[in-house]
Every structure is written in structure tokens, then in C-alpha cells.
Curated annotation (Swiss-Prot):
Gene responsible for this protein: ZIP3
Membrane-side (Extracellular) residue stretches: 26-54, 108-123, 206-216, 269-278, 337-339
Organism: Arabidopsis thaliana
Protein name, entry field: Zinc transporter 3
Topology class, membrane: Multi-pass membrane protein
Expression sites by tissue: Expressed predominantly in the roots of zinc-deficient plants.
Function (record text): Mediates zinc uptake from the rhizosphere. May also transport other divalent cations.
Signal peptide coordinates: 1-25
GO cellular component: plasma membrane
């Protein structure tokens, strides 16, 4: 199990560094060619004013992420937060609404805007790549979800055949283990989708030279990280990960956006968000992230919980969960005005 935890650490760490390096390299290599003058920044930028918001955002966003992801994990201390309680179902519905709105209202529109920018003059981009990439990402997420669960189930069935047929309770144990594994796969894939988006939006804040834009992103990101942390923390709690795995996953979620902000600040002077290479790289990453988040929220979070026997047998819980879902999606959609 320790080896798996180490592999998990290196996996998420490598993904984070790779994404940061790709975006950074894209900006560095885009200065040799002609530049597109599609800048959205005000000509009279106050870099000093923007910098104070960036510096303040690093610890604030970090703390907001920690609070969000740890809240559902406190079930061991507070019984009302345990996965089997009604409060947990309602909280998870709210978080699923947040993640769904993140995919539809934040990430997908950004990807569409980037991949349909007038700065991209190539005829190849007349094809609707945004939806295509999001669709492929959703299909790949489905494949990872089903193949990982199927692989574990087959291997476990082979082992269980060696046990005497006279033993009872084996079927229920197998089913429980498969469900736990599937929840773990869901948590890891969901974190990957969130990390991709977090790196991109963190770099956007760090590279922003406008105080107004930096302030708006700063405020929006606080709630953004906290709300997304609720959804991820809920999946981690249901996956029954060991303490080290919980620490690793929670830490990577919390630090990814602050790392993106720091990288953005480092490349702010050379960053050209309207360069074709940067638009393509960030557009593709955002589209893929949107596909992952939309699939995970609808299939693995909402569908799983809303068809759960506990939910189906409790009309009051269903109503509360739907209200929480609409509230989470509504609040996150409102944040799209600023970020």
C-alpha cells in the first residue's frame, strides 16, 4: 500500500509539473513569431496594484482549498459528517452542483473562447475542437472508470473462487470492495480534472497585470477552491483512503492553484495570453478538464447519490438534495461573472 501511495504522489506531482511546464514553454516559444494584438488588458495597467492581490491570493486560496477539502473528511470526529448521513448527502449534492457548473460555466466557455479566438487564423480551428476534446476526455474518463473497476473485480473473483462455496457473506464483501475501489478511482480522476483547471486559472491570475482583473479573480478563486474542495473531499471520504493517501491528495489539491499563481507571477513580464501557442495549449487543457468534470459530476457524483436507496426512500432528503444541487450550481454560475 505504501508503494501505491508513493506512486500516487509522483503521479499527481508529475502531472502538475508537466502542465505548468507546457504552459510556460508555450509562452516562451511564442515570442519568436508574429504576435496577435488581441489583448484584453487595459493599456494603463497598475502592476504594483495587481501584485498585492496576487500575493494575498497565495495564502488565502491555499487556506480556502484546505478548508473545503478537509470539511467532508471530519466525519471521524463529527458523526454528522459521515458518508452515510443525510447531511453528507446534501453537502455532496451541493458540491456536485459546484463541479457541474465549473465544467459548464467556467472551463468549457473559456476553452471555446480560446480555441475560437481571432488570433488563431488556421482553417483547422474551424472544426468544433472544444466540444470534440471535451467529449473524448469524458469517454476516456468512462474507460478509466470501468476498466479499473472491472480489472479489480476480475482479479478479486479469481481469488474468491479459492474460498469454499459454503462460506456466506462473500458476495456482499466483494461488492463492497468493488464499490470502494470505484470510489477511489472517481476521487483520483476527479482530482486530475480539477488540477488541470487549477493550474491554468492560477497562471491566469499570476500573469494578470490589471488590478481589477486580479481582484476579481482573487475573490472568485477563494470560493472556487472551497466549493470544489467539498466535492473532492466527499469522494476521498467515501473512498476510505489511508491517512497518507488522504494527506497526499488533499495537499496536491490545496497547493496546485497557489503554485499556478506563483508560476504566473514569474512569467508575467513575458506572458502573452493571446499568442496562438498559448491559446491552443490552454484551450485544449480546459476542454479536456471540462469533459472530465462534467462526466464526473453527472455520472459518478449525482447519478450515484440520487439513485442510492437511502435517497430513494426519503422524499425529504431528495428535496433537500435537489435544492442543494441548484444552490451549488447557481452560486458557481454566479462566480462566472468574475472568473
Amino acid at each position: 500500500m505504501k508503494t501505491k501511495n508513493v506512486k500516487l504522489l509522483f503521479f499527481f506531482f508529475s502531472v502538475s509539473l508537466l502542465l505548468i511546464a507546457v504552459v510556460n514553454a508555450a509562452e516562451g516559444h511564442s515570442h519568436g513569431g508574429p504576435k496577435c494584438e488581441c489583448s484584453h488588458e487595459d493599456d494603463h495597467e497598475n502592476k504594483a496594484g495587481a501584485r498585492k492581490y496576487k500575493i494575498a491570493a497565495i495564502p488565502t486560496v491555499l487556506i480556502a482549498g484546505i478548508i473545503g477539502v478537509l470539511f467532508p473528511l471530519l466525519g471521524k470526529v463529527f458523526p454528522s459528517l459521515r458518508p452515510e448521513t443525510c447531511f453528507f448527502f446534501v453537502t455532496k449534492a451541493f458540491a456536485a452542483g459546484v463541479i457541474l457548473a465549473t465544467g459548464f460555466m467556467h472551463v468549457l466557455p473559456e476553452a471555446y473562447e480560446m480555441l475560437n479566438s481571432p488570433c488563431l487564423t488556421s482553417e483547422a480551428w474551424e472544426f468544433p475542437f472544444t466540444g470534440f476534446i471535451a467529449m473524448i476526455a469524458a469517454i476516456l474518463t468512462l474507460s478509466v472508470d470501468t476498466f479499473a473497476t472491472s480489472s479489480f473485480y476480475k482479479s478479486h473473483c479469481k481469488a474468491s473462487k479459492r474460498v469454499s462455496d459454503g462460506e456466506t457473506g462473500e458476495s456482499s464483501v466483494d461488492s463492497e470492495k468493488v464499490q470502494i475501489l470505484r470510489t477511489r478511482v472517481i476521487a483520483q480522476v476527479l482530482e486530475l480534472g480539477i488540477i488541470v483547471h487549477s493550474v491554468v486559472i492560477g497562471i491566469s491570475l499570476g500573469a494578470s497585470q490589471s488590478p481589477d482583473a486580479a481582484k476579481a479573480l482573487f475573490i472568485a478563486l477563494m470560493f472556487h477552491q472551497c466549493f470544489e474542495g467539498l466535492g473532492l473531499g466527499g469522494c476521498i471520504a467515501q473512498g476510505k483512503f489511508k491517512c497518507l493517501s488522504v494527506t497526499i491528495m488533499s495537499t496536491f489539491f490545496a497547493i496546485t492553484t497557489p503554485i499556478g499563481i506563483v508560476v504566473g507571477m514569474g512569467i508575467a513580464n513575458s506572458y502573452d495570453e493571446s499568442s496562438p501557442t498559448a491559446l491552443i495549449v490552454q484551450g485544449v487543457l480546459n476542454a479536456a478538464s471540462a469533459g472530465i468534470l462534467i462526466y464526473m459530476s453527472l455520472v459518478d457524483l449525482l447519478a450515484a447519490d440520487f439513485t442510492h436507496p437511502k435517497m430513494q426512500s426519503n422524499t425529504g432528503l431528495q428535496i433537500m438534495a435537489h435544492i442543494a444541487l441548484l444552490l451549488g450550481a447557481g452560486l458557481m454560475s454566479l462566480l462566472a461573472k468574475w472568473a
